[in-house]
């Protein structure tokens, strides 16, 4: 069904300041799940939901890599304590990002 979660899988872990983003693993999991889109989420142990430059770079890079496989990035969420932020929503509001259909 459209919009249904097909899989929720931890893909990486890191330390207080960074985590490796395995783009190929994300794409392979999406293909194996027969997904049309991917939502990515990660935490900020610092307690701030503000995206780092690396967070924004990951959003752009993942979106571009997914598009080459006819997949789209649904969202990239940052979670910090009881708060969350949609990077894709923020970027779309600023005119820096458009969602793939």
Question: Where is each model-derived feature located?
Answer:
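Active-site-proximal loop/helix of nucleotide/amide-processing enzymes and allied scaffolds
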Residues: 2, 8, 12-100
């Amino acid at each position: 069904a459209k919009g249904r979660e097909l899989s929720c899988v931890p893909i990486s872990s890191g330390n207080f300041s960074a985590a490796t983003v395995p783009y190929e693993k994300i794409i392979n999991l999406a293909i194996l799940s027969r997904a049309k889109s991917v939502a990515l989420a990660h935490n900020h142990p610092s307690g701030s939901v503000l995206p780092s430059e690396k967070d924004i770079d990951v959003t752009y890079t993942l979106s571009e890599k997914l598009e080459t496989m006819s997949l789209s990035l649904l969202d990239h969420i940052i979670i910090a304590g009881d708060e969350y932020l949609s990077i894709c929503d923020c970027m779309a509001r600023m005119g820096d990002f458009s969602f793939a259909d």
